[in-house]
Amino acid sequence: NTRSRGLGDVYKRQLLKGLSTQIIDKVLKERITYMPGASTLLSTMKSNGCYSALVSGGFTMFTEKVSAYLGFDENHANVLLTSENKLTGKVKKPILGKKAKVEQLYRIANKLNLSARQVIAVGDGANDLDMLSKAGTGVALHAKPSVAEQCDIRINFGDLTALLFIQGYSKENFVF
């Protein structure tokens, strides 16, 4: 339910309140791991002239670094507000939620002279469902059961290279 999820998000942000912005670098170094197959997925897509965007309900302090490391063409997420090198526990408006994810899908498709039906979108949460339904290929990746049951394409056990197989790539086409 959206209301309880929203309260959880507020609670999580409040837990960050007052922490040094340096905690982000520490978390990135010590706690963040990349999903298996992420690097191969992005390298293979890039070498074949594909465009990729990371659109997340998370925070830009993380997505910018993840996006740069993996080679996404652009990334969009929520901006944590800071004051005097400390996190305030607040997020810059507008919040990137389910409506904004759909808007980004259309904006990016339009920018590339594509229809949304020519785009693959991947998600795992309820806030991804509208975006997944508007994309030509909406993929539930290791999604919650309530999300997976609403998507025709589900990846429950494979790594991110499964997205390459969905597009017709064979393993010998992968760029490692």
Name the predicted role of every residue range.
Residues 17-176:
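C-terminal cap/substrate-recognition subdomain and adjoining C-terminal extension
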